[in-house]
């Protein structure tokens, strides 16, 4: 760990080269941007995903050690994933708990309990299942990082997206608890709260919400942007930059934090 200021921009994000990193849901969206960014900075990356198509395409776009099909909500898939991590990387320095789904859109009296459970299982329980396997490896490495994806919906209640918001609030509690538990082992644990991420998922959410309230897709998009101080959606690479910072030596004393990368979402 450096005790002086960096001499140049090139020296700022040190400590990433050679890091062994697992990125869940890393073959598309935010996960792809994270894997791409960390790989370019010299990290050795394993990704998992549920999409065969995305997994097949990712290695031609990113320098990956391995791409593994796994559903993080399934114990047996997570066990198999970490067997691959140990075999391919020989250990682990960082876990990026990125996997998640949008979950159902609807009033609490309209949501199917199976859809509720599926959202919680992937967005929250999956982070637990991965962390419980990652922690012994990161301890054995002498310390490292866990970065988990929450959401602006983990800071603001989100009407008609109750399962998703509940899961993302849970991620923050999980993160703060792990930070206290793992700090003595030199493991930093932080949550990132992305805002409205550009891409097909939010387009689907906006369409569903617009249909519910009886307005056009364009008008609903404008309403979403009106609640963001910077009046812009968030790029997956905005989030990836924060992950790189947290995993680098620049983030050596940051733990237990919930960091918004959202253009300052004022409300949802």
Spans of features found by a protein language model:
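Short, small/polar-rich loop/turn modules that mediate ligand/substrate recognition or access, typified
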Residues: 183, 188, 254-256
